């Protein structure tokens, strides 16, 4: 076999290997870049912890917004805010840390920022997606799906999912609400922040991407 043929064979094998690795990575789902925790209270009762994985490779701007609001590094954010809208067999919504009723909140980029992309779809329960008031009106409000919500595809930006604590999400989903879907007893994000790799290792290990 000539040197030219050997070189050609080597390049072909290398391209095939790289393609296989790319397809394998893609088939596992979007990459989780950061892990965020919410510690939830309702009244004086601790409901537990929710751990989210953020898809910072697919929607970096949206994921960064959520991360910085969770850490409060800019002097404002999710800590102390409530889940103001809860609809059984649909979703739970929070993130309005200014008005606490769905009319407020702001992003780290200003009041609102555009839809980043709609590459990810609402295919399973436990997805983290941006609430909005129409196209390109993302702020700080988000929701967590409790069922498949495919009718939201192309309208709301999915940017993460629940890794641990779906039982806590279910507790919130089932809480009694008034006619405006607001919980009768406030459901509060008592604490939140960024998890280190060591602290979140188990969450990643058990995640279904």
Curated annotation (Swiss-Prot):
Residues 37-194 form the PPIase cyclophilin-type domain. It comes from the Eukaryota. Residues 1-25 form the signal peptide. Inhibited by cyclosporin A (CsA). One of its GO terms (molecular function) is peptidyl-prolyl cis-trans isomerase activity. The keyword Isomerase applies. A motif (Prevents secretion from ER) lies at residues 206-209. GO terms for cellular component: endoplasmic reticulum lumen; fungal-type vacuole. The keyword Glycoprotein applies. GO terms for biological process: protein folding. It catalyses: [protein]-peptidylproline (omega=180) = [protein]-peptidylproline (omega=0). It is found in: Endoplasmic reticulum lumen. InterPro entries: Cyclophilin-like_dom_sf, Cyclophilin-type_PPIase_CS, Cyclophilin-type_PPIase_dom. Belongs to the cyclophilin-type PPIase family. PPIase B subfamily. PPIases accelerate the folding of proteins. It catalyzes the cis-trans isomerization of proline imidic peptide bonds in oligopeptides. This is Peptidyl-prolyl cis-trans isomerase B2.
